[in-house]
Amino acid sequence: MERNPNPNNLPVELNRTSLYLGLLVVFTTGILFSSYFFN
């Protein structure tokens, strides 16, 4: 079980995490705005 620090692995994971966080924020704001407009 050896961990080889790959410099190309960290930005991909960080970009994927930020992408999922962005999608989650857009999804939650979309639900809030839709509930606000349909209320």
From Swiss-Prot:
It is a single-pass membrane protein. The chain crosses the membrane at residues 18-38. InterPro entries: PSII_PsbL (IPR003372), PSII_PsbL_sf (IPR037266). GO terms for biological process: photosynthesis. SUPFAM superfamilies: Photosystem II reaction center protein L, PsbL. It holds the Pfam family PsbL. GO terms for cellular component: photosystem II reaction center; plasma membrane-derived thylakoid membrane. It is found in: Cellular thylakoid membrane. The keyword Transmembrane helix applies. One of the components of the core complex of photosystem II (PSII). PSII is a light-driven water:plastoquinone oxidoreductase that uses light energy to abstract electrons from H(2)O, generating O(2) and a proton gradient subsequently used for ATP formation. It consists of a core antenna complex that captures photons, and an electron transfer chain that converts photonic excitation into a charge separation. This subunit is found at the monomer-monomer interface and is required for correct PSII assembly and/or dimerization. PSII is composed of 1 copy each of membrane proteins PsbA, PsbB, PsbC, PsbD, PsbE, PsbF, PsbH, PsbI, PsbJ, PsbK, PsbL, PsbM, PsbT, PsbX, PsbY, PsbZ, Psb30/Ycf12, peripheral proteins PsbO, CyanoQ (PsbQ), PsbU, PsbV and a large number of cofactors. It forms dimeric complexes. NCBIfam families: PRK00753.1. Belongs to the PsbL family. This is Photosystem II reaction center protein L.
